[in-house]
UniProtKB/Swiss-Prot annotation:
Belongs to the short-chain dehydrogenases/reductases (SDR) family. Substrate binds at S138. It comes from Drosophila montana. Gene3D superfamilies: NAD(P)-binding Rossmann-like Domain. The gene is Adh2. Its EC number is 1.1.1.1. It catalyses: a primary alcohol + NAD(+) = an aldehyde + NADH + H(+); a secondary alcohol + NAD(+) = a ketone + NADH + H(+). GO terms for molecular function: alcohol dehydrogenase (NAD+) activity. It comes from the Eukaryota. One of its GO terms (biological process) is alcohol metabolic process. GO terms for cellular component: cytoplasm. This is Alcohol dehydrogenase 2.
Length: 254
């Protein structure tokens, strides 16, 4: 999907990977970039507008843990303004295994709820035009960082949800793919809490191994958007974009 002249909603587009990805997106010339984020960062919004003045960049405060009805209300406002939305990026995430309920609420339930809300406007069974969803998951959805099992499980759940969305595309008209970054140098990974403090130095230990920058991740994210492959499981690691072939161990046969 060419980004030029498209309308894009980016949930958590001001975070570490999110902000660099927003920068790369506006360089590609969408018509509108609507950022929904819990963090209000007027400086970042002004920077994005300055990168490409032809792009309309809009910010709305948004917490992914709110009920679906509240998200639907916000999306109604956005759709009334833009008329159409081409791409939804779900990027909210936290890494803190002390906060069990919030980790699941942000990393998994928030993605499900935001997706559910936009179906009101996109689902072809309701006369909608369809759309594209890019969910930021994690390589920990493939193999856990076992010292943060809650985080890893929440990302595995988001990945499974995304894979199902892709399979449902013939019914809903909405396609989906997952973005799975490897260890990326962001404030998120410099210091965080392991589950039951099983490894106090888990962040430091991860950074002893090869990592990637947020810019490298963002540039590959844009490539994945442009590829626009329904059901793709993209691994963004060490500056590379890799299409992961998922191994099927069981099938429901329905």
């Amino acid at each position: 999907m060419a980004i030029a002249n498209k309308n894009i909603i980016f949930v958590a587009g001001l975070g570490g990977i999110g902000l660099d990805t927003s920068r790369e997106i506006v360089k590609s010339g969408p018509k509108n970039l609507v950022i929904l984020d819990r963090i209000d960062n007027p400086t970042a919004i002004a920077e994005l507008k300055a990168i490409n003045p032809k792009v309309t960049v809009t910010f709305y405060p948004y917490d992914v843990t709110v009920p679906v009805a509240e998200t639907t209300k916000l999306l109604k406002t956005i759709f009334a303004q833009l008329k159409t939305v081409d791409l939804l990026i779900n990027g909210a995430g936290i890494l803190d295994d002390h906060q069990i309920e919030r980790t699941i609420a942000v990393n998994f339930t928030g993605t499900v709820n935001t997706t559910t809300a936009i179906m009101e406007f996109w689902d072809k069974r309701k006369g909608g035009p369809g759309g594209v969803i890019a969910n930021i998951c994690s390589v920990t959805g493939f193999n856990a960082i076992y010292q943060v099992p809650v985080y890893s499980a929440s990302k595995a759940a988001a990945l499974s949800f995304t894979n199902s969305l892709a399979r449902l595309a013939p019914i809903t008209g909405v396609t989906a793919y997952s973005i799975n970054p490897g260890i990326t140098r962001t404030p998120l990974v410099h210091k965080f809490n392991s589950w039951l403090d099983v490894e106090p130095r888990v962040g430091e230990l991860l950074l002893e191994h090869p990592t990637q920058t947020t810019l490298e991740c963002a540039q590959n994210f844009v490539k994945a958007i442009e590829a626009n492959k329904n059901g793709a499981i993209w691994q963004l690691d060490l500056g590379q974009l890799i299409a992961v072939e998922w191994t099927k161990h069981w099938d429901s046969h329905i």
